[in-house]
A protein has these predicted regions:
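Short, hydrophobic/aromatic-rich segments at coil-to-beta transitions
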Residues: 30-38
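Conserved short-loop catalytic and cofactor-binding motifs
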Residues: 2, 35, 59-62
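Hydrophobic/basic alpha-helical segments enriched in Actinobacteria
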Residues: 26, 38-41
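Beta-strand/loop substructures that line and gate deep hydrophobic ligand-binding cavities in soluble
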Residues: 41-96
Length: 96
């Protein structure tokens, strides 16, 4: 599955959040300047954060599992946390 989100956070901040979110549950699998990957028994997730026109960052999260798997719920939760970091009043409501 692939998920996308546009944020006002800097790419480096998004990757810091990814390390904090996925690093406690999954092992680091790949590190590149704008990309991080983590893997474990539940699957593999790749986070890409790249600057996009103006002051925005495009965040792409891809997993190697089908939708609604455990790793997909982790991916969606991560994007909700990125949104909350950029907008602290955002309330996370999903069951993930």
């Amino acid at each position: 599955m692939r998920y996308f989100h546009r944020t006002s956070l800097a790419p480096d901040r998004v990757l810091e959040l990814a390390a904090a979110h996925f690093g406690t549950r999954l092992a680091p699998a790949e590190e590149a300047p704008r990309r991080r990957a983590y893997s474990g028994t539940v699957g593999r997730v790749t986070v890409t954060a790249r600057p996009e026109g103006g002051h925005y960052t495009l965040v792409e999260v891809a997993t190697d599992q089908v939708g609604e798997s455990e790793i997909d719920r982790l991916a969606k939760r991560f994007l909700a946390e990125v949104h909350r970091e950029a907008e602290p009043t955002h309330e996370i409501r999903g069951a993930y």
